[in-house]
């Protein structure tokens, strides 16, 4: 599953989009200052709107934060956890993250990722697990080949960002929960960058990388090849060794010098056999530790933030995505100069973006139009839309700003109670 248009994520900075619009060949020099003013107003409006969102979700998370004092289970209810997850879902979808299904996570072959090894996870430790991702693209990555003797480059489907939300099960084994470093009753959030789709399981705190069957076969084969000749020498002389031991323990009679020499030789071979076994076990353990280190390096070195620290980034990402969508939809509709149907505007935005930035996106036109209608920046006539003239658009933004600031100042920060200007 690889496609550049995997989700609604716009993989270009807002400043680049603004610069491209302000230098559009259809934008006159007289309109350029007003278009620049409009983007600033849009940024202010969505910042104000998402201020309410930020305060609301942070308040919901206070009782669920595992980083609060103590290490005892948190006394939280199912309803409390459910409300938080629903609000988190809204924020992430606004930031163009897409929830991944269990099948997508389970079917991802960990042997096709950067780790190139099987990953085992005790999922019974968790009562709720949610993966969100955005920006799937093929990334050229160097991976080990021939047991690390060579490296080769290959294209691996990789997400730009991944959010992992998990809640430990209240009925899970306390030993397993403690081993995973979790706290029951809490909600955990982890934000990652540049994670291969095949390595999603590596993000679990109790993930364990397995030594490959090929490596196990090599260790087993070398043990057999070296150990069988030693074992063949030990077995015939084992009776002599036992007799010598019995004599020294006083169980049997005296030991002849010839038997003693044979016993010493047998003991030496036996020690070599035991040493071989220990060496092979150390070899297996070393490869196992190497896999765990790679697991930690690849997954957790790409961790951007955890728990309460994720909210500022995610809310800012949501705000940024909303501004980019609304500004592109309005600006390109305005520069087109004629009313357009929603589907035509969608194609127009995607074509312009590909021509300007060389990237394919799946523009979320219905959401963009809904935002512009809410802010009174477009006029609907039947199934067509036209942009409000720039001076009027700025005037409507000013009015919306006043309404939003008054609502938040006097009515609290609940997002569903925010009002907008309707001409």
Show where each model-derived region lies.
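Soluble catalytic regions of membrane-associated enzymes that act on cell-envelope
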Residues: 358-370
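Transmembrane alpha-helical hairpins and terminal membrane-anchor modules
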Residues: 213-298
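Basic, amphipathic N-terminal segments
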Residues: 1-223
């Amino acid at each position: 599953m690889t496609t550049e248009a995997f989700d609604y994520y716009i993989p270009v900075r807002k400043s680049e989009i603004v610069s491209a619009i302000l230098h559009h060949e259809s934008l006159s020099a007289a309109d350029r200052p007003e278009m620049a003013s409009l983007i600033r107003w849009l940024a202010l409006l969505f910042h104000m709107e998402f201020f309410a969102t930020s305060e609301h979700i942070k308040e919901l998370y206070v009782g669920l934060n595992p980083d609060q004092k103590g290490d005892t289970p948190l006394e939280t209810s199912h309803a409390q956890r459910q409300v938080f997850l629903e609000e988190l879902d809204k924020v992430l979808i606004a930031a163009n993250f897409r929830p991944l299904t269990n099948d997508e996570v389970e079917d991802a072959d960990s042997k096709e990722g950067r780790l190139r090894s099987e990953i085992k996870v005790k999922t019974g430790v968790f009562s709720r697990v949610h993966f969100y991702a955005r920006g799937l693209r093929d990334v050229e990555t160097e991976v080990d080949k021939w047991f690390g003797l060579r490296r080769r480059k290959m294209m691996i489907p990789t997400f730009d960002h991944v959010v992992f939300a998990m809640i430990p099960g209240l009925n899970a084994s306390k030993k397993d929960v403690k081993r995973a470093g979790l706290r029951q009753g809490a909600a955990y959030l982890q934000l990652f960058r540049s994670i291969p789709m095949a390595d999603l399981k590596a993000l679990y705190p109790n993930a364990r990388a397995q030594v490959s069957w090929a490596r196990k076969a090599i260790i087993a084969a070398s043990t057999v090849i070296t150990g069988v000749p030693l074992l063949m020498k030990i077995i015939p002389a084992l009776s002599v060794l036992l007799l010598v031991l019995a004599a020294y323990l006083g169980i049997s009679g005296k030991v002849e010098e010839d038997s003693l020499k044979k016993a010493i030789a047998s003991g030496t071979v036996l020690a070599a056999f035991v040493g071989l076994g220990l060496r092979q076990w150390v070899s297996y353990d070393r490869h196992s530790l190497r896999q765990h280190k790679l697991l930690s390096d690849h997954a957790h070195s790409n961790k951007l933030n955890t728990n309460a620290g994720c909210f500022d980034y995610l809310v800012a990402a949501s705000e940024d995505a909303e501004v980019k969508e609304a500004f592109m939809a309005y600006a390109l509709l305005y520069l087109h100069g004629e009313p357009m149907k929603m589907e035509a505007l969608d194609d127009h935005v995607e074509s312009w973006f590909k021509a300007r930035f060389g990237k394919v996106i799946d523009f979320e036109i219905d959401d963009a139009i809904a935002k512009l209608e809410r802010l009174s920046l477009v006029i609907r006539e039947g199934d067509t839309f036209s942009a409000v003239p720039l001076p009027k658009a700025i005037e409507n933004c000013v009015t919306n700003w006043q309404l939003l600031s008054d609502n938040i100042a006097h009515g609290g920060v609940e997002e569903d109670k925010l009002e907008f200007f309707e001409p």
